[in-house]
C-alpha cells in the first residue's frame, strides 16, 4: 500500500474496523487512522492480505478471521 511504503501511515495503526453491534448487518472500516470514539476497551489487531497484486478500483482487501463471538453483548475474539 503506497501510503505505508512512503511512511505516511504506520503499519501498526493502518485501519480500524467498527462492527456496529451484534444485531446489525453493517459496520465501517477506517483506513489510516483509529476512531477512539468507537471503542472503550483494548483494540484487537488482525493481519490483512490483498486479494490482488495491485490496489485499484477493482481490488479488495481481505481480513481473515477464524471466529468472532458476542458474549453478554461484548465482542470476544
Swiss-Prot record:
Top-level taxon of origin: Eukaryota
Pfam families: Asp (PF00026)
InterPro entries reported in the protein's UniProt record: PEPTIDASE_A1, Peptidase_aspartic_dom_sf
Domain annotation Peptidase A1: ranges: 1-77
Name of the protein in its database record: Uncharacterized protein YGL258W-A
Amino acid at each position: 500500500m503506497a501510503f505505508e511504503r512512503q511512511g505516511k501511515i504506520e503499519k501498526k495503526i493502518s485501519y480500524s474496523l467498527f462492527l456496529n453491534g451484534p444485531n446489525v448487518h453493517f459496520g465501517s472500516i477506517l483506513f489510516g487512522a483509529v476512531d477512539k470514539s468507537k471503542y472503550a476497551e483494548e483494540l484487537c489487531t488482525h493481519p490483512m492480505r490483498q486479494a490482488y497484486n495491485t490496489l485499484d478500483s477493482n481490488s479488495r482487501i481481505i481480513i481473515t478471521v477464524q471466529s468472532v463471538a458476542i458474549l453478554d453483548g461484548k465482542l470476544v475474539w
